[in-house]
Structures are given as C-alpha cells and as structure tokens.
Swiss-Prot record:
Family according to the record: Belongs to the universal ribosomal protein uS17 family.
Any one Gene Ontology molecular-function term assigned to this protein's record: rRNA binding
Gene Ontology annotations of biological process type: translation
GO cellular component terms, semicolon-separated: cytosolic small ribosomal subunit
Gene this protein is translated from: rpsQ
Protein name: Small ribosomal subunit protein uS17
Length: 79
C-alpha cells in the first residue's frame, strides 16, 4: 500500500524536532451542495528544525515515531 502524502501549513514549531501541520480539505455538503472547508492538525517529524510557522509543506505517512507522530515532513512548497 502506498504512503499517503498531504499538503498543509505549519501552525506550530515550538516542540523539538516536531512541527504541527494544518491540512485543509474541501468537500460538497451532502444536503446544501455548498463547498465546505474542514481542517485537521497533524504532528510531523522535522529532524533539523528547519520549518517555521507559515511554511507550506508536504508530509508523508511513516511508521509511528511517538505517541502522536505518524508523519514526516518531506518538502517545503514555500511561504
């Protein structure tokens, strides 16, 4: 099974070797047929503490690193 890759914005970088990434998804509401935005936060591994708040990054699913971390940052898309 291939690893999932998501794109989001870094919203937290206070933890050592960890960033919090907000991933937003859009979908059509089943009743109203209006586009709805929902977001979810993922903790991702950042080995060199190189990503800062506001950076757009891609994260990839990986084996569990800690209780909450199951994602690792693979690339930055820009600010």
């Amino acid at each position: 099974m291939p690893k999932r890759i998501l794109q989001g914005v870094v919203v937290g970088d206070k933890n050592e070797k960890t960033v919090v990434v907000r991933v937003e998804r859009r979908f059509a509401h089943p009743l109203l047929q209006k586009t709805v935005r929902r977001s979810k936060k993922y903790k991702a591994h950042d080995e060199n503490n190189e990503y800062k708040i506001g950076d757009t990054v891609s994260i990839e699913e990986c084996a569990p690193i800690s209780k909450d971390k199951r994602w690792t940052v693979i690339a930055a898309q820009g600010k």
